[in-house]
């Protein structure tokens, strides 16, 4: 099977037929996609605990109490103890990967401290864990109608409420997700 042209910096939308609890109704930002596989972060699955838990673990006292309420997101089932901060490019963080004009992923604690002290990026998502696919696995899943591919839209990543992202991403493709059949077919 030939590799689909790179899907890096695009979004995956879970089809209604995907019932895996890790990915059901998920929207995934693809950070990397190449011959070796793919890596992405789920951007619409808030966890049951806020950022204050991370502040406590790192012994950080935020200067603004509302920072405690920032949600943590389930980024995927791989290494769920590992944090990833998705943000617009700014600052010189110790461990950042620039992906495109509006998306940088940082994994170092210095950005968490900056967020706590109101010196970090304004538009930010903080995820725990990530999603990964082996060589050709994502291509096979796309071909079997497990995922839709959606071009990156800044508003999906930073503005649309979490609970609306799945449906909204589909609408950007002209698709009402709740009207799709879970039965797949090929013409």
Swiss-Prot record:
SUPFAM superfamilies: VC0467-like. The lineage of its organism: Bacteria, Pseudomonadati, Pseudomonadota, Gammaproteobacteria, Legionellales. It comes from the Bacteria. It holds the Pfam family DUF179. InterPro entries: AlgH-like (IPR003774). NCBIfam families: PRK00228.1-1 (NF001266). Disulfide bonds: none annotated. GO terms for cellular component: cytosol. Belongs to the UPF0301 (AlgH) family. This is UPF0301 protein lpl0620.
């Amino acid at each position: 099977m030939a590799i689909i042209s790179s899907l890096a910096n695009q979004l995956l939308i879970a089809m209604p037929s995907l019932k895996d609890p890790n990915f059901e109704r998920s929207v995934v930002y693809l950070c990397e996609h190449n011959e070796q596989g793919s890596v992405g972060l789920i951007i619409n699955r808030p966890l049951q605990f806020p950022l204050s838990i991370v502040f406590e673990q790192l012994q950080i006292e935020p200067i603004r109490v509302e920072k405690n309420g920032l949600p943590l997101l389930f980024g995927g089932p791989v290494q769920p103890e590992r944090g990833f901060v998705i943000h617009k490019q700014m600052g010189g963080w110790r461990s950042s990967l620039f992906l495109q004009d509006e998306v940088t992923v940082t994994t170092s604690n210095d950005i968490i401290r900056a967020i706590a002290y109101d010196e970090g990026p304004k538009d930010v998502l903080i995820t725990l864990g990530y999603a990964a696919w082996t060589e050709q696995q994502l291509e096979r899943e796309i071909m079997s109608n497990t995922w839709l591919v959606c071009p990156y839209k800044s508003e999906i990543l930073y503005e649309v409420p979490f609970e609306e992202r799945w449906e909204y991403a589909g609408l950007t493709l002209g698709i009402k997700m709740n009207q799709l059949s879970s039965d797949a077919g090929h013409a």
